[in-house]
UniProtKB/Swiss-Prot annotation:
Its EC number is 1.14.13.9. Keywords: FAD, Flavoprotein, Membrane, Mitochondrion, Mitochondrion outer membrane, Monooxygenase, NADP, Oxidoreductase, Pyridine nucleotide biosynthesis, Transmembrane, Transmembrane helix. It is found in: Mitochondrion outer membrane. The lineage of its organism: Eukaryota, Metazoa, Chordata, Craniata, Vertebrata. Transmembrane domains are required for enzymatic activity. This is Kynurenine 3-monooxygenase. One of its GO terms (molecular function) is kynurenine 3-monooxygenase activity. It catalyses: L-kynurenine + NADPH + O2 + H(+) = 3-hydroxy-L-kynurenine + NADP(+) + H2O.
Amino acid sequence: MASSDTQGKRVAVIGGGLVGALNACFLAKRNFQVDVYEAREDIRVAKSARGRSINLALSYRGRQALKAIGLEDQIVSKGVPMKARMIHSLSGKKSAIPYGNKSQYILSISRENLNKDLLTAVESYANAKVHFGHKLSKCIPEEGVLTVLGPDKVPRDVTCDLVVGCDGAYSTVRAHLMKKPRFDYTQQYIPHGYMELTIPPKNGEYAMEPNCLHIWPRNAYMMIALPNMDKSFTCTLFMPFEEFERLPTRSDVLDFFQKNFPDAIPLMGEQALMRDFFLLPAQPMISVKCSPFHLKSHCVLMGDAAHAIVPFFGQGMNAGFEDCLVFDELMDKFNNNLSMCLPEFSRFRIPDDHAISDLSMYNYIEMRAHVNSRWFLFQKLLDKFLHAIMPSTFIPLYTMVAFTRIRYHEAVLRWHWQKKVINRGLFVLGSLIAIGGTYLLVHHLSLRPLEFLRRPAWMGTTGYWTRSTDISLQVPWSY
């Protein structure tokens, strides 16, 4: 691209989280003058950043976005590979379900460390600046005017050519767009909340298998654990809020864990479990959908601001990072023409982001209930077998989502088609087995034991059975 296409144009990125910081890097590479406005203080110097910290699962889509700005190797080196789900049954039995083939894995990444690295990357560009402690209070994107409140709480107007809303599920930018006609918006809170717990290292090593995402599925609730670089595990307990409210005391919590997660107690330690459980209240999870993602050539939403999703497919960050990558690819395609790029971004991306939102809701049930069933394990084995013999025809859903850039909505369509083909194949196979079994049964039952029914009535049966005493009784199993 020619630098004159963008040089001198100002972009205001609202939100300095993961997607906002990554977007700033992409835009700075295109020679925009980039200003990132982040309401929080700089997490790199903050004393405590505890809060929203469900560990992240970095997969192929996210890695491709990081690769495009030259950060993939740096980030991957700070992650722990996870090659399988490790299912913990109530009895303590463990069973591994691989995510894909032997070379495929996802990475457990620290949200905080990733955000720090991305902010540092933004500041490496001379044409980009991050304004910490600056909160958006008013947005008029058609006029390119924003009002922000700095650390001194004094309103200050700034001007820009493009507003990029990356300010999360409760986006202020989106709230302003919602006042516009023909802007659709829905949100849904799920009944479950989440709480973060910790499994510390044991004798300086991991207390469990490190290269797995550990799951304790218990139907109505579940717990997961992701490995960290310091040999600890970050655990997340997902449970209906009503269940959390039934655990007001330490003894209630201990009884609950002894009943539902007995093998986790010695791993966490009773004292650490109590400390973590009562440190913060359970946090809500929200799913957000909106349409369109843009306003003319002036404003665009990305990441959670456009499509907050529940965390059960591990694609929230990856989908947000892919937003940035798709937008960058469209900027190439349309030679940095914002009036063409923004509408195409909405048209292209909305079906995909809504599809991964729906898949995450589906996985919300699968992870806490279905993984316990033998039918689920059979389906996974069948998917793996079919993919091995027909790799380009049958691709497991998780493989399409986590290890390719097949569009999310196309992956869903293909998944439904594959399920239909497999179900029909199993029906035909079952029918053939039933027909074959019936034929063999009828064939054997039509042999000699029924001959007496065809004898003349006047011969009676006495003579028949009398003669039969002189020889072995001729029934099918005597042949």
